[in-house]
Curated annotation (Swiss-Prot):
It comes from Mus musculus (Mouse). CDD domains: EphR_LBD_A4 (cd10482), FN3 (cd00063), PTKc_EphR_A (cd05066), SAM_EPH-A4 (cd09545). Receptor tyrosine kinase which binds membrane-bound ephrin family ligands residing on adjacent cells, leading to contact-dependent bidirectional signaling into neighboring cells. The signaling pathway downstream of the receptor is referred to as forward signaling while the signaling pathway downstream of the ephrin ligand is referred to as reverse signaling. Highly promiscuous, it has the unique property among Eph receptors to bind and to be physiologically activated by both GPI-anchored ephrin-A and transmembrane ephrin-B ligands including EFNA1 and EFNB3. Belongs to the protein kinase superfamily. Tyr protein kinase family. Ephrin receptor subfamily. GO terms for molecular function: ATP binding; DH domain binding; ephrin receptor binding; GPI-linked ephrin receptor activity; identical protein binding; PH domain binding; protein kinase activity; protein tyrosine kinase binding. This is Ephrin type-A receptor 4.
């Protein structure tokens, strides 16, 4: 009987040879240790028992290549224990290996008379060993890996039809520690053929990321372990940040950190740093590509870090390598001189050729030349003055003064730029020679009062620095200071001193002196102010009486000064004491009150980060896996271990590579905001990493993620008390923010995070950045994006965000929580939502929502923001509801979720209308009166049972009209239920 089964099984194997002899190409991250299909000749595995158990069979494929298989089919005999052991397999450093088994198995039901002995499974075992010395199978040494069952088994019919039913199973085992291992297959009574056995391990293959090469890395021992690998920069590159990656258990590289940059003279191409081509260059180690040599420059070798300037062209010291080479300018044009006595005005035009630069300036060279030989010139010296300046002129004119009269001067105007010093040439200048005229003397530099009496002042002065000829006389002008030159006197003298007499005692006078030559008067000197005495100077200090008088007067003056000073000090002390008291009182009143500080008000945004966020060493952080992608980069989970503290789970936001300064500032601004908050219902900031890359924000880890997704996942699983508890936590956090004068602007269930204890915490403080990437945002008429469905009408219309607008958003969050994460306003468009709110519509109560909670929602949705409750009042209301669970009884409607009709607070009271016509007129829908009458809806009792399909059936197809009518219908239904006592009033 067994021989027949072998024959059948052997015949069936010919039908599957095509499936197992295809090209054996395995993934790059799998390293094969054993492949039975690749063995040339017999496998020679050890079987126990040697006879009657496993049997090696060779079959030929269509290319006449033998395939070695093992089969066994002892299904007629009970208590089978047939073992087959492989040769010793070296593990090559792998800690976890994988076994891929391809096999066929006979369906026991297709074999007659074997129901008690036939099995459809076999067992897989392994045994570790440091050497290949085991010649026999010792069953006790082997550890079981798994029991292998077939997904598909074949029958006699399949054999006849040559239908292939090949099973493939993969198992893994680890961690392994010895040099090698054996595999064993135990048959317990199945009809089975091992078509192929492949043993392999996984590795993260050699790869290049961010110009860093990461070697082949064998995966870790656990199926969830990550192996940190440091990369090495490719040739011709250097580290910018330490390149690291994590090798995952599946053989895939994860979370690249850091990067390398191509050296100067090299650029990245296909993951390599290749030398710049001839004619190209790269000056620095950056991620930029090689650039073509700028104009008037060249490179003659590969890998150039700069380009050489053409002959006659230069590059200034502060010129970047990317700037063109330039040359000095040509000479200025059209030099014109204008001589005025001993001053000269020069004007000229810009050079015809600027040399390719914009930093042109002009220098003036002055030379004084002899009359007999103009070629013998010498510098003018420091006595000559230039307006506005002599060198570095940005204008094309200069005024030169304080020259000597009747003297020959040569003036050179040089045009210079940033490269003139490399090639000074006379071609850059233009000159002119002039002769000064006869000139008046210069002003007198120093005038002194030698003696002052009651009625006179004795003056003396120096000769002008440049007399420009023979001084004929000096003129002294003086006047009383109070007259301010309205009435003055003139005294002339040939000497350089004079006595001015006939003055008034104790009077201030102002004196001016000027010189005159044959060319005329020079300028007056600077004013000299002198005050005449009250008594003759000889009286003061002569005799005892004068001494007593002087002491008495001096003492009186001192006494008056002391009294005045004492009074002033007393007043100041009084004011200071009062001001100090007020300041102390103000400080006392403000003690303990914290106010939110906007980080964008800091001139240096980094200062806000340093002030409000704690810097964490990157070595304290271990990234475990990526859990999402945010606006600025990846969001990961990981662990934080600060020295002296226990290790905690954290969430890690990373800033993606290639960020701009603005993106970095916006990214860290959220940390500057979070760092100011300390409340159990506000997400807690652990710290930031800014001193290395990637830049990271570290916060506490919230296991259950965002509130909206969490509620949808757990629809209907919580009690009303639990839901109200969540709302209470959110309200408490918002009260804290409101007390700190912080306006959130984007309060929604998606921005509330939930931890493992169902504690809800407010997060996402990035609304100060416009919500460009928020899928719920929509353009408003004033530009920018805001989440329409959660935003108060005044914030939509006027962008007026306050704590009251946050209260409106909180009402929407209440509705989201009680509806288990439904989308507010369902599938209505944003424009329809805005229009409906403007018309007074509000969201209906979710299914099973207590009346008290929906009423609180309606309070939050008051049109006038001053009518909305404060967050403190909201928290108090929720506390009362939690303490009084009877107030949270269900509403009358529990059959289904409400339809898409919105509630209209302006709907008429049911008691105020008596007919369908009155009702339609009250809600301004009387145009449909005939539709209702024709369809038989003639009483209000019939109307309250209508649905949206009923309205469409009677010809009301406009969605907005359907919503308005259904809103009023629902309001009437609620009023009827209240009148019949089916709802508990709060």
């Amino acid at each position: 009987m067994a021989g027949i089964f072998y024959f059948i099984l052997f015949s069936f194997l010919f039908g599957i040879c095509d499936a197992v002899t295809g090209s054996r190409v395995y993934p790059a991250n799998e390293v094969t240790l054993l492949d039975s299909r690749s063995v040339q000749g017999e496998l020679g595995w050890i079987a126990s028992p040697l006879e009657g158990g496993w049997e090696e069979v060779s079959i030929m494929d269509e290319k006449n290549t033998p395939i070695r298989t093992y089969q066994v089919c002892n299904v007629m005999e009970a208590s089978q224990n047939n073992w087959l052991r492989t040769d010793w397999i070296t593990r090559e450093g792998a800690q976890r290996v994988y076994i891929e088994i391809k096999f066929t198995l006979r369906d026991c039901n297709s074999l007659p008379g074997v129901m008690g002995t036939c099995k459809e499974t076999f067992n897989l075992y392994y045994y570790e060993s440091d050497n290949d010395k085991e010649r026999f199978i010792r069953e006790s040494q082997f550890g079981k890996i798994d029991t292998i069952a077939a997904d598909e088994s074949f029958t006699q019919v399949d054999i006849g039809d040559r239908i292939m039913k090949l099973n493939t199973e993969i198992r893994d085992v680890g961690p392994l520690s010895k040099k090698g291992f054996y595999l064993a297959f135990q048959d317990v009574g199945a009809c089975i053929a091992l078509v192929s056995v492949r043993v392999f391990y996984k590795k993260c293959p050699l790869t290049v990321r961010n110009l860093a090469q990461f070697p082949d890395t064998i995966t870790g021992a656990d199926t969830s372990s990550l192996v940190e690998v440091r990369g090495s920069c490719v040739n011709n590159s250097e580290e910018k940040d330490v390149p690291k990656m994590y090798c995952g258990a599946d053989g895939e590289w994860l979370v690249p950190i850091g990067n390398c940059l191509c050296n100067a003279g090299h650029e990245e191409q296909n993951g390599e740093c290749q030398a710049c081509k001839i004619g190209y260059y790269k000056a620095l180690s950056t991620d930029a590509s090689c650039a073509k040599c700028p104009p008037h420059s060249y490179s003659v070798w590969e890998g150039a870090t700069s380009c050489t300037c053409d002959r006659g062209f230069f590059r200034a010291d502060n010129d970047a390598a990317s700037m063109p080479c330039t040359r000095p300018p040509s000479a200025p044009l059209n030099l014109i001189s204008n001589v005025n006595e001993t001053s000269v005005n020069l004007e000229w035009s810009s050079p015809q050729n600027t040399g390719g630069r914009q930093d042109i300036s002009y220098n003036v060279v002055c030379k004084k030349c002899g009359a007999g030989d103009p070629s013998k010139c010498r510098p003018c010296g420091s006595g000559v003055h230039y307006t506005p300046q002599q060198n570095g002129l940005k204008t094309t004119r200069v005024s030169i003064t304080d020259l000597l009269a009747h003297t020959n001067y040569t003036f050179e105007i040089w045009a210079v730029n940033g490269v003139s010093k490399y090639n000074p040439s006379p071609d850059q200048s233009v000159s002119v020679t002039v002769t000064t005229n006869q000139a008046a003397p210069s002003s007198i530099a120093l005038v002194q009062a030698k003696e002052v009496t009651r009625y006179s002042v004795a003056l003396a002065w120096l000769e002008p620095d440049r007399p420009n000829g023979v001084i004929l006389e000096y003129e002294v002008k003086y006047y009383e200071k109070d007259q301010n030159e309205r009435s003055y006197r003139i005294v002339r003298t040939a000497a350089r001193n004079t006595d001015i007499k006939g003055l008034n005692p104790l009077t201030s006078y102002v004196f001016h002196v000027r010189a005159r030559t044959a060319a005329g008067y020079g300028d007056f000197s600077e004013p000299l102010e002198v005050t005449t005495n009250t008594v003759p100077s000889r009286i003061i200090g002569d005799g005892a009486n004068s001494t007593v008088l002087l002491v008495s007067v001096s003492g009186s003056v001192v006494l008056v000064v002391i009294l005045i000073a004492a009074f002033v000090i007393s007043r100041r002390r009084s004011k200071y004491s009062k001001a100090k008291q007020e300041a102390d009182e103000e400080k006392h009143l403000n003690q303990g009150v914290r106010t939110y500080v906007d980080p964008f008000t800091y001139e240096d945004p980094n200062q806000a980060v340093r002030e409000f966020a704690k810097e964490i060493d990157a070595s304290c952080i271990k990234i475990e896996k990526v859990i999402g992608v945010g606006e600025f980069g990846e969001v990961c989970s990981g662990r934080l271990k600060v020295p002296g503290k226990r290790e905690i789970c954290v969430a890690i936001k990373t800033l993606k590579a290639g960020y701009t300064d603005k993106q970095r500032r916006d990214f860290l601004s959220e940390a500057s905001i979070m760092g100011q908050f300390d409340h159990p219902n506000i997400i807690h900031l652990e710290g930031v990493v800014t001193k290395c890359k990637p830049v990271m924000i570290i916060t506490e880890y919230m296991e259950n993620g965002s509130l909206d997704a969490f509620l949808r996942k757990n629809d209907g699983r919580f009690t009303v008390i639990q839901l109200v508890g969540m709302l209470r936590g959110i309200g408490s956090g918002m009260k804290y923010l409101s007390d700190m004068s912080y306006v959130h602007r984007d309060l929604a269930a998606r921005n509330i995070l939930v931890n493992s204890n169902l504690v809800c915490k407010v997060s996402d403080f990035g609304m100060s950045r416009v919500l460009e990437d928020d899928p719920e945002a929509a353009y408003t008429t004033r530009g920018g994006k805001i989440p329409i469905r959660w935003t108060a009408p005044e914030a939509i219309a006027y962008r007026k965000f306050t704590s009251a607008s946050d209260v409106w958003s909180y009402g929407i969050v209440m509705w989201e929580v009680m509806s288990y994460g439904e989308r507010p306003y369902w599938d209505m468009s944003n424009q329809d939502v805005i229009k409906a709110i403007e018309e007074g519509y509000r969201l209906p109560p979710p299914m099973d929502c207590p009346i008290a909670l929906h009423q609180l929602m309606l309070d939050c949705w008051q049109k006038e923001r001053s009518d909305r409750p404060k967050f403190g009042q909201i928290v108090n209301m929720l506390d009362k509801l939690i303490r009084n669970p009877n107030s949270l009884k269900r509403t009358g409607s529990e059959s289904s979720r409400p339809n898409t009709a919105l509630l209209d607070p302006s709907s008429p009271e049911f008691s105020a209308v008596v007919s369908v016509g009155d009702w339609l007129q009250a809600i301004k829908m009387d145009r449909y009166k005939d539709n209702f009458t024709a369809a038989g809806y003639t009483t209000l009792e019939a109307v309250v049972h209508m649905s949206q399909d009923d309205l469409a059936r009677i010809g009301i197809t406009a969605i907005t009209h359907q919503n308005k009518i259904l809103s009023s219908v629902q309001a009437m239904r609620t009023q009827m239920q209240q009148m019949h006592g089916r709802m508990v009033p709060v």
